């Protein structure tokens, strides 16, 4: 990774950890007061901004059960289905997940210095042990769902600023830790406008346009806490 990419990765990690003020003051919160500043709101660049969260990652119907999908839903400060936390407190290098047996040697070789996280469902701030993930090694159009946070690879998310340096640190692709394609990796994607449909799943699709023109529906940002 180039020095510039490393700097952007650090900045994006700080943004996700809530330590960088690029997100500013958001106009709406997706964290309940009980979850507060521990919560992280993951939002699509296409349908939200740091100043107006719009639509954020949400557990479908708030059900804390393995296999329940995660979707994009309108941000709400009173819906515990939108309460997500980073269990380690913030991003860590992919190499740390490799040392813990959570990603493969190939993933570590390609992404080792880039930041990565797990994202745990924690309604009202209470951890469930279930993380947003994919059920198997990532494949085209696979939907995200809750899976045990102990599952290696599939529960790890890489903040892939190297594949979209022009939009970092505010927006970045989020690549699954089970990935085996390092040219066009499987990244979080949404299809359709969540304002016009009842159910908008988050799915895996090959990252396109990288590194110069990744589409907005494959770029994500993060905000923290209540307002």
Residue ranges and their predicted role:
Residues 31-227:
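Lectin-like carbohydrate-binding module/patch detector with strong preference for beta-trefoil
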